[in-house]
Amino acid sequence: MEPSSWSGSESPAENMERMSDSADKPIDNDAEGVWSPDIEQSFQEALAIYPPCGRRKIILSDEGKMYGRNELIARYIKLRTGKTRTRKQVSSHIQVLARRKSRDFHSKLKDQTAKDKALQHMAAMSSAQIVSATAIHNKLGLPGIPRPTFPGAPGFWPGMIQTGQPGSSQDVKPFVQQAYPIQPAVTAPIPGFEPASAPAPSVPAWQGRSIGTTKLRLVEFSAFLEQQRDPDSYNKHLFVHIGHANHSYSDPLLESVDIRQIYDKFPEKKGGLKELFGKGPQNAFFLVKFWADLNCNIQDDAGAFYGVTSQYESSENMTVTCSTKVCSFGKQVVEKVETEYARFENGRFVYRINRSPMCEYMINFIHKLKHLPEKYMMNSVLENFTILLVVTNRDTQETLLCMACVFEVSNSEHGAQHHIYRLVKD
């Protein structure tokens, strides 16, 4: 990676001045029952994150450990709610829901031929596949299992869980109120029914479900604070994080937001969001809503390191330029440009920008944000704070990926969260 530097003028001080079902009986001593609303919410989120995998194990990239699906669901419930559910309890609940879902299909299908066909497909599916499958529901136009919402703060967008790794960074879209008009993902109708184990399409599952195109894909992105507790240990806190995810064809496609809704939040001059989108390719543009985790102790000491790590991959060998523009009230405040060369790993070209130092402006901005007494004050400041990330092919100047990032402060119990949208212009 070539040396890089931040350039900008406005100080953060100046900027801050401007800116469940009752039939399911409990089987342990939990007063709310085994599948209370918060546990059911986490259970449904985990179903969306971890696709059915039969007897195979899922490897968590952050840990390198192998887990069965039910283990991961139980683990996720523990992380989200603090309540312990065993993998056997998870398995039992999946079977209960599968039977209920089968009855639901059966009762709503009036045509006997369609009913027989649906039952034939479901007979070949496991309980996990029936509970996780969305294809049959979508094609029949049947409602899915209702999911309770987070008790949210104003300004959160409506929506569902997306893929991500459980832990300190959840890929969740907290919901209540809608900031921009959201367009649901549209898929072409397919006649008949398909079991969850149907042959995979020729395109990879991540396309249309994550940040990426056929030329370049974002694998991971994080902004973090690393503090040295003692000579032998470091504490790492993630402000924002997009983790590596194992996408499934049953995962929903990304929703769309009209790019004109956010033009005023980003620079309009040469190289701004509007000009870039006009040049295209338009499938390379994404909006990321981050709920930043500021629930950490920030100390002014020499042992603190503020950094950003990102990783991309491609089937092509390129030299890429990564531009990060920090914006306030739609105006660029500071920009960092980095050049990265490809490394061939496991049959693909990898571009990794590791532990890139944050600029002084961002560090001071985080400090001042933390000193605000109320969360609504922080969110008020963040309404006028955005970041534009643009990855370009250095030789052809083609835009490979563009991520327009907007921010709110996460509820401390939820940790860092995010949700991804496609940017379109209808």
UniProtKB/Swiss-Prot annotation:
Q: What is its main location?
A: nucleus
Which compartment or compartments is the protein found in? Nucleus
Q: Name one GO cellular component term.
A: chromatin
N-acetylmethionine modifications at: M1
- What mutagenesis or variant effect is reported for Y421H? In SCRA; loss of interaction with YAP1 and also activation by YAP1
Q: Which InterPro entries match?
A: TEA/ATTS_dom (IPR000818), TEA/ATTS_sf (IPR038096), TEC1_TEAD_TF (IPR050937), TEF_metazoa (IPR016361), YBD (IPR041086)
Modified after translation how? Lactylation by AARS1 promotes nuclear localization and stabilization of YAP1, leading to increased Hippo signaling pathway. Delactylated by SIRT1.
Give the sites modified to N6-lactoyllysine. K108
Decide whether keyword Transcription regulation is in the record.
Answer: yes
Show the segment(s) annotated as Transcriptional activation.
167-426
Q: Which PANTHER family match?
A: TRANSCRIPTIONAL ENHANCER FACTOR TEF RELATED, TRANSCRIPTIONAL ENHANCER FACTOR TEF-1
Q: What is this protein called?
A: Transcriptional enhancer factor TEF-1
This protein's species is Homo sapiens (Human)
